[in-house]
Protein backbone atom coordinates (compact mmCIF):
# COMPACT_ATOMS: atom_id res chain seq x y z
CA UNK A 1 0.00 0.00 0.00
CA UNK A 2 1.13 3.56 -0.69
CA UNK A 3 1.89 5.30 2.61
CA UNK A 4 -0.23 8.33 3.52
CA UNK A 5 -3.15 8.24 1.10
CA UNK A 6 -5.09 11.54 0.83
CA UNK A 7 -8.69 11.75 2.06
CA UNK A 8 -11.27 13.35 -0.25
CA UNK A 9 -12.46 16.84 0.80
CA UNK A 10 -9.84 17.07 3.59
CA UNK A 11 -8.31 20.49 4.24
CA UNK A 12 -5.12 19.25 5.91
CA UNK A 13 -2.73 16.52 4.83
CA UNK A 14 -0.06 15.16 7.19
CA UNK A 15 2.50 12.47 6.41
CA UNK A 16 5.53 11.55 8.51
CA UNK A 17 6.12 8.10 7.04
CA UNK A 18 9.92 7.50 6.99
CA UNK A 19 9.72 5.31 3.86
CA UNK A 20 7.85 7.87 1.74
CA UNK A 21 10.02 8.70 -1.29
CA UNK A 22 7.53 10.30 -3.72
CA UNK A 23 5.36 13.35 -3.06
CA UNK A 24 1.72 12.25 -2.61
CA UNK A 25 -0.62 12.74 -5.56
CA UNK A 26 -4.38 13.14 -5.63
CA UNK A 27 -4.63 15.76 -2.89
CA UNK A 28 -8.09 17.39 -2.98
CA UNK A 29 -8.44 21.02 -4.18
CA UNK A 30 -9.81 21.85 -0.70
CA UNK A 31 -6.33 21.32 0.82
CA UNK A 32 -5.19 24.33 2.88
CA UNK A 33 -2.15 22.85 4.65
CA UNK A 34 0.35 20.11 3.78
CA UNK A 35 2.91 18.57 6.13
CA UNK A 36 5.26 16.01 4.61
CA UNK A 37 8.06 15.76 7.17
CA UNK A 38 10.66 13.24 8.39
CA UNK A 39 10.42 11.21 5.18
CA UNK A 40 12.83 9.94 2.52
CA UNK A 41 11.56 12.52 0.02
CA UNK A 42 14.53 13.64 -2.12
CA UNK A 43 12.90 15.29 -5.14
CA UNK A 44 9.71 17.14 -6.03
CA UNK A 45 8.15 17.23 -9.51
CA UNK A 46 7.42 20.74 -10.87
CA UNK A 47 3.68 19.92 -10.79
CA UNK A 48 3.63 18.62 -7.18
CA UNK A 49 1.31 21.44 -6.05
CA UNK A 50 -0.86 21.71 -9.18
CA UNK A 51 -4.60 21.80 -8.51
CA UNK A 52 -4.24 23.16 -4.96
CA UNK A 53 -5.46 26.77 -5.36
CA UNK A 54 -6.24 27.22 -1.65
CA UNK A 55 -2.94 26.03 -0.22
CA UNK A 56 -1.67 28.34 2.54
CA UNK A 57 0.86 26.23 4.44
CA UNK A 58 3.55 23.88 3.13
CA UNK A 59 5.73 22.10 5.71
CA UNK A 60 8.55 20.02 4.19
CA UNK A 61 11.04 19.87 7.06
CA UNK A 62 13.45 17.01 7.75
CA UNK A 63 13.38 15.40 4.33
CA UNK A 64 16.23 14.84 1.86
CA UNK A 65 15.47 17.60 -0.64
CA UNK A 66 18.63 18.77 -2.42
CA UNK A 67 16.93 20.98 -5.04
CA UNK A 68 13.55 22.54 -5.82
CA UNK A 69 11.96 23.00 -9.26
CA UNK A 70 11.72 26.65 -10.31
CA UNK A 71 7.98 26.33 -11.04
CA UNK A 72 7.11 24.50 -7.80
CA UNK A 73 5.17 27.34 -6.14
CA UNK A 74 3.55 28.81 -9.25
CA UNK A 75 0.18 27.01 -8.69
CA UNK A 76 -0.10 28.23 -5.05
CA UNK A 77 -0.24 32.07 -5.04
CA UNK A 78 -2.12 31.98 -1.72
CA UNK A 79 0.84 30.40 0.15
CA UNK A 80 1.51 32.06 3.53
CA UNK A 81 3.91 29.61 5.23
CA UNK A 82 6.81 27.61 3.77
CA UNK A 83 9.02 25.50 6.04
CA UNK A 84 12.04 23.73 4.51
CA UNK A 85 13.99 23.18 7.75
CA UNK A 86 16.68 20.48 7.76
CA UNK A 87 16.97 19.49 4.13
CA UNK A 88 20.01 19.39 1.81
CA UNK A 89 19.37 22.54 -0.23
CA UNK A 90 22.54 24.29 -1.38
CA UNK A 91 20.71 26.75 -3.64
CA UNK A 92 17.24 27.81 -4.74
CA UNK A 93 15.99 28.81 -8.20
CA UNK A 94 16.23 32.59 -8.64
CA UNK A 95 12.51 33.04 -9.38
CA UNK A 96 11.10 30.49 -6.97
CA UNK A 97 9.09 33.06 -4.98
CA UNK A 98 7.99 35.23 -7.93
CA UNK A 99 4.32 34.25 -7.59
CA UNK A 100 4.10 33.95 -3.78
CA UNK A 101 3.77 37.62 -2.84
CA UNK A 102 1.52 36.74 0.15
CA UNK A 103 4.23 34.66 1.87
CA UNK A 104 4.59 35.66 5.54
CA UNK A 105 6.73 32.91 7.05
CA UNK A 106 9.80 31.43 5.31
CA UNK A 107 12.06 28.93 7.08
CA UNK A 108 15.25 27.70 5.37
CA UNK A 109 17.09 26.75 8.56
CA UNK A 110 19.46 23.80 8.59
CA UNK A 111 20.27 23.55 4.90
CA UNK A 112 23.51 24.05 2.95
CA UNK A 113 22.97 27.50 1.47
CA UNK A 114 26.27 29.28 0.82
CA UNK A 115 25.02 32.29 -1.17
CA UNK A 116 21.89 34.43 -0.86
CA UNK A 117 20.32 35.64 -4.10
CA UNK A 118 18.58 39.03 -3.79
CA UNK A 119 16.13 37.78 -6.46
CA UNK A 120 14.57 35.42 -3.90
CA UNK A 121 13.24 38.30 -1.83
CA UNK A 122 12.17 40.73 -4.57
CA UNK A 123 8.44 39.92 -4.35
CA UNK A 124 8.12 39.19 -0.62
CA UNK A 125 6.90 42.55 0.70
CA UNK A 126 4.55 40.80 3.16
CA UNK A 127 7.16 38.46 4.65
CA UNK A 128 7.26 38.80 8.46
CA UNK A 129 9.53 35.91 9.49
CA UNK A 130 12.73 34.78 7.74
CA UNK A 131 14.87 32.00 9.22
CA UNK A 132 18.21 31.34 7.51
CA UNK A 133 19.98 29.88 10.55
CA UNK A 134 22.40 26.96 10.43
CA UNK A 135 23.43 27.25 6.80
CA UNK A 136 26.89 27.99 5.34
CA UNK A 137 26.41 31.66 4.45
CA UNK A 138 29.68 33.63 4.30
CA UNK A 139 28.09 36.94 3.29
CA UNK A 140 24.81 38.71 2.71
CA UNK A 141 24.78 40.94 -0.40
CA UNK A 142 24.07 44.64 0.31
CA UNK A 143 20.38 45.50 -0.08
CA UNK A 144 19.43 41.81 -0.40
CA UNK A 145 16.69 42.25 2.21
CA UNK A 146 15.61 45.71 1.01
CA UNK A 147 12.18 44.56 -0.36
CA UNK A 148 11.23 42.97 2.99
CA UNK A 149 9.51 46.01 4.45
CA UNK A 150 7.18 43.92 6.66
CA UNK A 151 9.91 41.69 8.13
CA UNK A 152 9.78 41.47 11.93
CA UNK A 153 12.20 38.59 12.64
CA UNK A 154 15.46 37.73 10.86
CA UNK A 155 17.56 34.75 11.99
CA UNK A 156 21.08 34.43 10.54
CA UNK A 157 22.55 32.55 13.51
CA UNK A 158 25.10 29.75 13.12
CA UNK A 159 26.37 30.71 9.69
CA UNK A 160 29.90 31.71 8.59
CA UNK A 161 29.47 35.51 8.50
CA UNK A 162 32.74 37.34 9.26
CA UNK A 163 31.45 40.81 8.33
CA UNK A 164 28.12 42.49 7.62
CA UNK A 165 28.06 44.39 4.33
CA UNK A 166 27.20 48.10 4.46
CA UNK A 167 23.47 48.42 3.92
CA UNK A 168 22.76 44.77 4.74
CA UNK A 169 19.79 45.80 6.90
CA UNK A 170 18.54 48.59 4.62
CA UNK A 171 14.77 48.56 4.17
CA UNK A 172 14.00 46.56 7.33
CA UNK A 173 12.13 49.34 9.14
CA UNK A 174 9.74 46.88 10.83
CA UNK A 175 12.46 44.53 12.10
CA UNK A 176 12.10 43.75 15.83
CA UNK A 177 14.27 40.65 16.26
CA UNK A 178 17.73 40.03 14.78
CA UNK A 179 19.75 36.91 15.59
CA UNK A 180 23.44 36.83 14.56
CA UNK A 181 24.57 34.34 17.22
CA UNK A 182 27.35 31.89 16.46
CA UNK A 183 28.94 33.54 13.43
CA UNK A 184 32.52 34.82 12.98
CA UNK A 185 31.86 38.53 13.30
CA UNK A 186 35.05 40.33 14.36
CA UNK A 187 33.82 43.89 13.91
CA UNK A 188 30.69 45.85 13.04
CA UNK A 189 30.37 49.07 11.04
CA UNK A 190 29.25 52.15 13.02
CA UNK A 191 26.03 52.55 10.99
CA UNK A 192 25.06 48.86 11.04
CA UNK A 193 21.82 49.35 13.01
CA UNK A 194 20.70 52.75 11.64
CA UNK A 195 18.16 51.11 9.24
CA UNK A 196 16.43 49.10 12.02
CA UNK A 197 15.17 51.59 14.63
CA UNK A 198 12.33 49.25 15.71
CA UNK A 199 14.72 46.53 16.91
CA UNK A 200 13.76 45.08 20.32
CA UNK A 201 15.90 41.92 20.53
CA UNK A 202 19.51 41.67 19.30
CA UNK A 203 21.59 38.49 19.65
CA UNK A 204 25.35 38.74 18.99
CA UNK A 205 26.64 36.07 21.37
CA UNK A 206 29.34 33.57 20.40
CA UNK A 207 31.07 35.72 17.79
CA UNK A 208 34.61 37.14 17.71
CA UNK A 209 33.82 40.79 18.47
CA UNK A 210 36.84 42.59 19.96
CA UNK A 211 35.49 46.14 19.98
CA UNK A 212 32.26 48.00 19.26
CA UNK A 213 32.21 51.34 17.38
CA UNK A 214 31.26 54.37 19.49
CA UNK A 215 27.51 54.88 19.48
CA UNK A 216 26.71 51.75 17.46
CA UNK A 217 23.56 51.08 19.51
CA UNK A 218 22.35 54.72 19.70
CA UNK A 219 19.65 54.21 17.00
CA UNK A 220 18.11 51.35 19.02
CA UNK A 221 15.83 53.23 21.39
CA UNK A 222 13.40 50.33 21.77
CA UNK A 223 15.94 47.60 22.55
CA UNK A 224 14.83 45.27 25.37
CA UNK A 225 17.32 42.40 25.00
CA UNK A 226 21.01 42.62 24.04
CA UNK A 227 23.20 39.50 24.12
CA UNK A 228 26.96 40.02 23.70
CA UNK A 229 28.05 36.94 25.66
CA UNK A 230 31.22 35.02 24.81
CA UNK A 231 32.93 37.51 22.55
CA UNK A 232 36.33 39.17 23.13
CA UNK A 233 35.08 42.57 24.28
CA UNK A 234 36.96 44.68 26.81
CA UNK A 235 34.85 47.85 26.51
CA UNK A 236 31.09 48.22 26.18
CA UNK A 237 28.60 50.26 24.16
CA UNK A 238 24.92 50.37 25.15
CA UNK A 239 21.74 51.87 23.70
CA UNK A 240 20.33 54.95 25.44
CA UNK A 241 18.28 54.24 28.52
CA UNK A 242 14.61 54.36 27.65
CA UNK A 243 11.48 54.51 29.81
CA UNK A 244 10.06 51.14 30.74
CA UNK A 245 11.73 47.92 31.83
CA UNK A 246 15.51 47.77 32.22
CA UNK A 247 17.55 46.40 29.32
CA UNK A 248 18.13 42.64 29.59
CA UNK A 249 21.90 42.45 29.01
CA UNK A 250 24.14 39.39 28.78
CA UNK A 251 27.83 40.34 28.60
CA UNK A 252 29.20 37.21 30.27
CA UNK A 253 32.31 35.46 28.99
CA UNK A 254 34.16 38.61 27.83
CA UNK A 255 37.53 39.90 29.19
CA UNK A 256 36.14 43.16 30.60
CA UNK A 257 38.42 46.04 31.52
CA UNK A 258 36.74 47.32 34.67
CA UNK A 259 37.82 50.92 34.17
CA UNK A 260 35.81 54.03 35.01
CA UNK A 261 34.24 54.26 31.54
CA UNK A 262 32.63 50.80 31.78
CA UNK A 263 31.56 51.25 35.39
CA UNK A 264 30.02 54.68 34.73
CA UNK A 265 28.11 53.33 31.72
CA UNK A 266 26.64 50.44 33.70
CA UNK A 267 25.62 52.79 36.51
CA UNK A 268 23.97 55.18 34.08
CA UNK A 269 22.01 52.63 32.04
CA UNK A 270 21.39 50.21 34.94
CA UNK A 271 20.73 47.14 32.78
CA UNK A 272 19.40 43.87 34.14
CA UNK A 273 22.60 41.80 33.99
CA UNK A 274 21.81 38.23 32.97
CA UNK A 275 24.32 35.62 34.25
CA UNK A 276 26.10 38.23 36.38
CA UNK A 277 28.09 35.43 38.02
CA UNK A 278 29.94 34.78 34.74
CA UNK A 279 30.46 38.46 33.96
CA UNK A 280 33.96 39.04 35.31
CA UNK A 281 36.68 41.67 35.18
CA UNK A 282 39.90 40.67 33.38
CA UNK A 283 41.67 43.91 34.30
CA UNK A 284 42.96 45.95 36.09
CA UNK A 285 44.79 43.45 38.30
CA UNK A 286 43.04 44.50 41.51
CA UNK A 287 39.64 43.58 40.05
CA UNK A 288 40.64 40.48 38.10
CA UNK A 289 38.08 37.63 38.43
CA UNK A 290 35.68 39.82 40.42
CA UNK A 291 32.11 40.17 39.19
CA UNK A 292 31.60 43.28 37.07
CA UNK A 293 28.31 43.97 38.85
CA UNK A 294 29.98 43.90 42.26
CA UNK A 295 32.76 46.26 41.17
CA UNK A 296 30.27 48.61 39.47
CA UNK A 297 28.34 49.26 42.65
CA UNK A 298 31.30 49.10 45.05
CA UNK A 299 32.36 52.32 46.73
CA UNK A 300 36.11 51.82 46.25
CA UNK A 301 36.50 52.33 42.51
CA UNK A 302 38.11 55.82 42.49
CA UNK A 303 35.73 56.84 39.68
Protein language model features and the residues they cover:
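Recurring C-terminal helix/loop segment of individual leucine-rich repeat
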Residues: 22-26, 46-50, 70-74, 94-98, ...
